[in-house]
UniProtKB/Swiss-Prot annotation:
InterPro entries for the chain: CheY-like_superfamily, Sig_transdc_resp-reg_C-effctor, Sig_transdc_resp-reg_receiver, Tscrpt_reg_LuxR_C, WalR-like
Cellular compartments annotated: Cytoplasm
Species per Swiss-Prot/TrEMBL record: Bacillus subtilis (strain 168)
Phylogenetic classification of the source organism: Bacteria, Bacillati, Bacillota, Bacilli, Bacillales
Protein name, UniProt field: Uncharacterized transcriptional regulatory protein YhcZ
Entry function: Member of the two-component regulatory system YhcY/YhcZ.
Location of the Response regulatory domain: 2-118
Membrane-spanning parts: none
Gene name per UniProt: yhcZ
Domain HTH luxR-type, residue spans: 142-207
């Protein structure tokens, strides 16, 4: 898996590069110190994942995410930042980030964010209250779609919002991975959302059964 690291701090970039060097299936193919440089490196290296800080010169991370998604729609971007406030979290997710992690995240959790490359979705538990508050404050014409889901589809949706992979959902619900995939496909269609990221945000909006990680 090819990764690009975009952060304006040299020490952070080198630290991440050193850490990922210990992972057999991860290769750091580029680094960037500014938002503009990140776009150039993404174009040159076509990485599977991009670790993006939000505070960078020339172009901040949020603008860089927007432009990267516009120019390279298949790009999977993981925000790695020290900001946990709503003013940064929500715009970053709306810009197209597939994961949002804080810089004090445990290394093992950071490695798990690679799952966004396979369609998974990862949010730091520290930012979930901000996401929930934002979604609750939005006008809600879509609520009826939730009630179209079966009980099992709701269970699967809750697990998606908690950042679990299909394999983990299957184990938690005692069903096969193939059955999980079927439920995911069905609930995406019923909710009229394009991917697991949007489904997870939908789940956070309704705080399903209080089971979503706070």
């Amino acid at each position: 898996m090819k990764i690009v690291i975009a952060d304006d701090h040299h020490v952070v970039r080198k630290g991440l590069r050193f850490f990922f060097a210990t992972q057999d299936d991860i290769e750091v193919v580029g680094e960037a110190a500014t938002g503009l440089e990140a776009l150039r490196v993404i174009e040159e290296t076509k990485p599977d994942l991009v670790l993006m800080d939000l505070s960078m010169p020339e172009m901040d991370g949020i603008q860089a995410i927007k432009k990267a998604i516009q120019q390279f729609p298949d790009t999977n971007i993981i925000v790695l930042t020290s900001y946990s406030d709503q003013e940064h979290v929500i715009p970053a997710l709306q810009a197209g980030a597939k994961a949002y992690q804080l810089k004090d995240t445990e290394p093992e959790e950071l490695v798990k964010t690679r799952q966004v490359h396979g369609g998974e979705y990862k949010l730091s538990t520290a930012i979930m209250p901000h996401v929930l508050t934002h979604m609750k404050n939005q006008h809600d014409p879509e609520k009826e779609k939730y009630y179209q889901l079966t009980r099992r589809e709701k269970d699967v949706l809750t697990e998606i919002a908690n950042g679990k992979s299909n394999k983990e959902i299957a184990a938690a619900l005692f069903i096969s991975e193939k059955t999980v995939k079927t439920h995911v496909s069905n609930l995406l269609a019923k909710l009229e959302v394009a991917d697991r990221t949007q489904a997870a945000l939908f789940a956070v909006k309704y705080n399903l059964n209080g089971e979503i990680s706070k």
